[in-house]
Amino acid sequence: MFVTQILIVGVVACIIFDLWQRVFQKLTAIPPSNWAMVGRWSLGLVTNGQLIACDLESQAKRKNELAVGWLVHYSVAIGYAAAYAWLMRATVLQAELIDGLIFGVISVAVPYFFFLPCLGKGMLARLTPNPPLVCALALLMHSLFGASIGLGFAVFAD
């Protein structure tokens, strides 16, 4: 049953993340994440072994890149839920909002120092037109996502 809980919590937290990006776009005109670019990067990694992409936006579109991007997005979300579950089993985290929020804030290190550089954006988005905005948005989204995971596991608590 615990694997099912991880899957459900990861997917639901990711849905909340995606819905909030749509609401945020309506409020601010800032577009949501472009999962096609994640798919393009993923396909490049698989076919060419290229971990760090250069100028990803100008590269030719790849077949099914959007679908692959969404698949990677949801797979990573489930991975985060599994990490949270493991930390709960190790009694580092509890199934609650505050621990989820802390987890989300810490988890933003992954896009800051891994995904953004891999997508050709540089560490801390330094190669983007507005690095502070990109970093702030990542922190906002990962905070919401982490809180959603913490609350999600709280729903399953005995």
Task: Identify the meaning behind each predicted range.
Residues 1-158:
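Juxtamembrane/disordered regions of integral membrane proteins
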